[in-house]
Amino acid sequence: MEWALVVQAAWSTKQLSRSSRPPMKIRNLDLTDNAINAEHEALGLPPVEDDVSHPSNHPVLRIAVWAVVFLLVAILCYLASRLFNPANGRSGTELILETLRGDTFWKAAAVGLLAQTVDGALGMAYGITSTSFLLASGASPAVASASVHIAEVFTTGISGISHVKLGNVNKNLFLRLLIPGMIGAILGAWTVSSIDGNIIKPYVAAYLFCMGLYIISKVFKTIKANKKAPKHVAKLGLFGGFVDAVGGGGWGPVVTTTLVGTGQDPRTTIGSVNLAEFFLTFVSAIVFAILVGEGPWPIVAGLVVGGLFAAPFAALLTRRLNARVLLAMVGTVISVISVYNIYKAFN
């Protein structure tokens, strides 16, 4: 009898210890045939979780994608209401014809074609290329940067969604860049809109000149892979957002090239930086639209229309010239135009 009581007590203690253990983590495994699982199977490892093999399924990135879609639809509705609202005294057709008759639209279309060709061939430098040429054509820094950022809202939004769908976005890197980048963009847009264009123009041109030299310097760099988490990402995002808004471009050359230059994975770095760029471009475009006013809309239309026809030219450049030659050419053109803009600012 006593032995039975001892056995019963031991069994009760064992059951109690089992019930007090923390529950095992429920893992959402990806059991499909894919490259990662094939590698794990060869090494005798278990399948990866679904969030690893399909990063676009992460709730944070799904929310980001829906936010991009919602904001793009809202912008289209706003622009349509502004264009066809009879309260402005003119019909939408009249406004379109007036824009097409002006030289501003066609100059901006040529700039948009060139800048989007460069961006399509190199994957960056749309902002600094278009801003450099707009400044040379006589636009003020605020109007040039405002036009570029408003035009970029749609391209960066579509690009960001594409990168998420292709699994090119690192959630942690995206979140670390997002808020600092937006704060920097707001501060930069307010700064360039608040200072007289004649005063700030030579400084913006000097910044673009340095960016041209920076692009040229990439021709001579060799990148070594680095799997460690990048440091000072928030500071980099804040600085990149600020100079991007002030100079009309630079988020990609500053942030992407800095992170990739330290050895970070190019695929997820480019995707994460592109997705974050939409949100900082959006907030800076709002600030510019409030502070600059109606001035940039013909330039915005020209940049967008010109950029629509750039794809075949970008493909041709990519096929005929290697990336190093393109970098050297683009960096040289931006630097030369910036020197010209500095000369004009002081004469």
Predicted regions and their residues:
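Juxtamembrane transmembrane-helix boundary motif
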Residues: 2-115, 120, 132-137, 141, ...
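Early transmembrane hairpin of solute transport permeases
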Residues: 128, 132, 136, 143-156, ...
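Feature detects amphipathic, helix-rich regulatory segments
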Residues: 271, 284-287
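Transmembrane helix-bundle signature of multi-pass membrane transporters/permeases
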Residues: 145-153, 270-278, 308, 334
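Short, contiguous, pocket-lining structural segments
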Residues: 247-250, 274
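Membrane-embedded alpha-helical segments of transport systems
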Residues: 150-158, 183-184, 191, 275-283
